[in-house]
Amino acid sequence: MSRYRGPRFKKIRRLGALPGLTSKRPRSGSDFKNQSRFGKKSQYRIRLEEKQKLRFHYGLTEQQLLRYVHIAGKAKGSTDQVLLQLLEMRLDNILFRLGMASTIPAARQLVNHRHILVNGRIVDIPSYRCKPRDIITSKDKQRSKVLIQNSIESSPHEELPKHLTIDSFQYKGLVNQIIDSKLIGLKINELLVVEYYSRQT
């Protein structure tokens, strides 16, 4: 299944706020209306919707998300928490969290078009897994700097996650540590996502 490129508001109206996909928010009460219209949700549908939330927020294909679930399942620790850490440490998501891109699809474009350096080298792979002490900067070209500057200036200035630091004057971000999955703050039950895939096998 390919990455979703359809109407974004349609997705947030059904699934709720997905800040990685779009800065728009669903109207208050829309979740209740949807639930009333479709009746009581089955356990399968609840797990499916949590999986869809995670997939659309991070802008992944079905295959990509399944691969991350498999990697998390083989790692030490709780599968659901490792899964979130893997997704949060992707370069496209780090750019979004730093405010250097307004959404994860916008961050992916910056990376694909070679505007981003990690530790002084161009990285054009959005799924690149960032590590502690990685330094993320824009390429030393006017167009690259303008794109980053516009995003930083228009970002909602929410409190930066503790695992990241940004110098907005030098267009430079620093990864301080691997994120604690408990501090991610998404309204997604990642355990239900893992359960969804475990029941598919």
Swiss-Prot record:
GO molecular function: rRNA binding; structural constituent of ribosome
PROSITE patterns: RIBOSOMAL_S4, S4
Broad class of the protein's primary localization: plastid
A single cellular component GO annotation: chloroplast
Domain S4 RNA-binding: 89-150
One biological process term in Gene Ontology: ribosomal small subunit biogenesis
Keyword terms, alphabetized: Chloroplast, Plastid, Ribonucleoprotein, Ribosomal protein, RNA-binding, rRNA-binding
Compartment list: Plastid, Chloroplast
Pfam families: Ribosomal_S4, S4
InterPro entries recorded: Ribosomal_uS4 (IPR022801), Ribosomal_uS4_bac-type (IPR005709), Ribosomal_uS4_CS (IPR018079), Ribosomal_uS4_N (IPR001912), S4_RNA-bd (IPR002942), S4_RNA-bd_sf (IPR036986)
Family listed: Belongs to the universal ribosomal protein uS4 family.
Cited function: One of the primary rRNA binding proteins, it binds directly to 16S rRNA where it nucleates assembly of the body of the 30S subunit.
Subunit structure: Part of the 30S ribosomal subunit. Contacts protein S5. The interaction surface between S4 and S5 is involved in control of translational fidelity.
Protein name: Small ribosomal subunit protein uS4c
